[in-house]
Every structure is written in structure tokens, then in C-alpha cells.
Amino acid sequence: MGGKTVTRADLAEAVYRKVGLSRTESAALVEMILDEVCDAIVNGETVKLSSFATFQVRDKNERIGRNPKTGEEVPILPRRVMTFKASNVLKQRILQEHQKRQGKTSK
């Protein structure tokens, strides 16, 4: 299933090719967008990108975990975690692409 990892530079290059901004402007635009998303998430805001996904910060309570080597109970401190929930549109696109690839390999 391996695929390429898309980097900030790849996103900037795509903006450059599709929008027609200079490479410098494209890179700056990508940075600005990512900075805005990061700032919102850090501030505890939910970021919803329609037809893509929702990013949300969630508080997790303290709980008891277990050291897998010793079996000893260990407290896991409360913390904040970020969640990513793909939209139904994105899930459908992933499923369709998977089915399309399966069809090619099975023939």
C-alpha cells in the first residue's frame, strides 16, 4: 500500500502549479494556512475543513495503566490529545480508490 509522504514543499509546489502564484508566494500561503490551523488547535478550537476532516483537542482524564513488562499498575496522567476525524466525503474517496486499485490487481 506504500505511498509517498506529502510535505509542505509538495503542497507549495501544487499551489504553484494549480493557482499560478510564484513559488515563494505559494510556500508562504501554505505556511500561513498551516499556522492558522495550528494556532486554532493549540487554542482548543475545533478546526473543520468541509469535505476533508475535523481536528479537535480532547481532554483525557487520569487513569490506571499497566506496565506490560512487569504488570505493575501505573497512573497515566491527564493530558490533552488531538483527534482527527475524516469526513464522510474523504472516507468515500478513500474507499473508491481502494476498490479501483483492487479491481486492477485482481484482473
From Swiss-Prot:
Pfam families: Bac_DNA_binding. The keyword DNA-binding applies. Keywords: DNA recombination, DNA-binding, Transcription, Transcription regulation, Translation regulation. InterPro entries: Hist_DNA-bd, Histone-like_DNA-bd_CS, IHF-like_DNA-bd_dom_sf, IHF_alpha. The keyword Endoplasmic reticulum does not apply. GO terms for biological process: DNA recombination; positive regulation of metabolic process; regulation of DNA-templated transcription; regulation of translation. Coiled coil: none annotated. CDD domains: IHF_A. SMART domains: BHL. Belongs to the bacterial histone-like protein family. HAMAP family: IHF_alpha (MF_00380). Heterodimer of an alpha and a beta chain. This protein is one of the two subunits of integration host factor, a specific DNA-binding protein that functions in genetic recombination as well as in transcriptional and translational control. This is Integration host factor subunit alpha. The gene is ihfA.
